[in-house]
Regions:
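Active-site segment of SDR-like NAD(P)-dependent oxidoreductases
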Residues: 1-4, 51-54
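Catalytic helix-loop patch of NAD(P)-dependent Rossmann-fold dehydrogenases
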Residues: 3, 7-47
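Glycine/proline-rich active-site loop of Rossmann-fold NAD(P)-dependent oxidoreductases
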Residues: 8-9, 28-29, 41-43, 54-64, ...
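A conserved pocket-lining segment of Rossmann-fold NAD(P)-dependent short-chain dehydrogenase/reductase
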Residues: 18, 63-86
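Conserved loop-to-helix N-cap of the C-terminal "lid" that shapes the substrate pocket in Rossmann-like
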Residues: 47, 57, 79-92, 105, ...
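Short, amphipathic alpha-helical "lid/cap" segments that border enzyme active or binding sites
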Residues: 88-96, 175-179
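Mid/C-terminal beta-alpha module of Rossmann-like enzyme folds, strongest
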Residues: 92-146, 186-189
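C-terminal amphipathic/interface module of NAD(P)-dependent oxidoreductases
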Residues: 147-190
Length: 190
């Protein structure tokens, strides 16, 4: 997820959308200003705004798989809200590509953001279990600025081509890799 963007509902987000960081990540704005000042002084300041990472060894994927197998998913926010992510492989590719890019700010995410419900249901389907229950959307507000930040709908656009257009395509690859490593047996991959 792109934690500093505001909740934009169904609207597309690009790098020109003003940031609204929460208390815990407001230093992102300072970091981006530093990159801009570096560029103004003749350097090549590059900012990559990553989505939520996923990969075979990602702790959040391991935890989410365990939760979904247990019938629930601790992802706050409205089920229809968008969720932007990026595979570890595509994130690495974006970093390498940035070495050749001009100064600027770039979203580094999958080409197609998924709605939270679609993200969770398709992962449950790949695991061969029923769709998980999720906490009601309003519960995120009980966790203050962090909860509200995590519940935002962020349908972000991406300028680079990804190996996996969305988590829907990337997930089977990471689940197969997990299975090959014997990290977590999988019932079915679709």
């Amino acid at each position: 997820m792109l934690p500093a963007y505001p909740d934009c509902g169904d609207r597309w987000i690009d790098e020109t959308v003003a940031l609204e960081p929460a208390r815990y990540n407001r230093t992102l704005v300072d970091a981006e200003r530093s990159a801009q000042r570096f560029t103004e002084r003749g350097g090549t300041g590059i900012v990559l705004r990553f989505g939520a990472f996923y990969g075979p060894d990602a702790n959040q994927i391991t935890n989410l798989i365990q939760s979904i197998r247990g019938g629930w998913a601790p992802i706050p926010g409205r089920p229809e809200a968008f969720f932007s992510s990026i595979s570890h492989d595509d994130a690495a590719t974006a970093v390498v590509a940035a070495l050749q890019a001009g100064a600027g700010t770039y979203n580094a995410i999958d080409d197609e953001p998924l709605r939270r419900r679609e993200y969770l249901d398709s992962l449950a389907q790949a695991l061969g279990v029923p769709p998980p229950k999720t906490p009601p959307g309003w519960i995120a507000h009980l966790f203050g600025s962090l909860g509200r930040l995590l519940a935002r709908s962020q349908r972000a656009s991406n300028v680079c081509a990804s190996k996996y257009p969305s988590n829907r395509e990337g997930r089977p690859a990471i689940l197969l890799e997990r299975q090959a490593r014997n990290a977590a047996p999988i019932a079915r991959i679709s």
